C-alpha cells in the first residue's frame, strides 16, 4: 500500500469497516483525511464508523466537516440530523432534516425523521404533517405509516392508529414476503 495515498487508506478503512473492525476503519479514514483534508467521502465513512461505535458527537463533527467540503450534500444533512436526534438535540435534527428536504422535497424518509423530531419535542401537529407528507410521497413507506400510527395512538385516535398499523403491516409484507 502506498502510505501517501489517501485513496489507499480509504480503501483499507472500507475493508476494515466491512469486517466490523470499526476502530481500525476510523484510524484508516483519519489517515486518509490527514493526507487529504478535503476528502468528503472519508469524513462520511468515518462518521458512519463512529455511529457504529455509538460515538455520535464524533459522527456529528465529521458530518459537519464533510459539509464544509460539500455544502450541498443533502445526505450529510440527513445523516447529521439523525445523529442529532439520537443525541436528543431535536431542534438541530429538525434544522438538518429541513435542509435535506429543501434539497430533495421528495425524500419521504427525511420527512419521517423530521416528524420524529417534532414528535419528540411534543409538536404533534407538525409531526403529523410530516408523516402525512411522507405517505403522500411514498405510499409504500411502512415506517411512515407506523410512525403516524404511533402518533395517532398517543393522541387517542385508536381507530386511525389501528388502520395505519394494518397498512404498515401489509406494505411491509409486500416489501419482504415470507415463504409459506
Residue ranges and their predicted role:
Residues 1-180:
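Alpha-helical tetratricopeptide repeat
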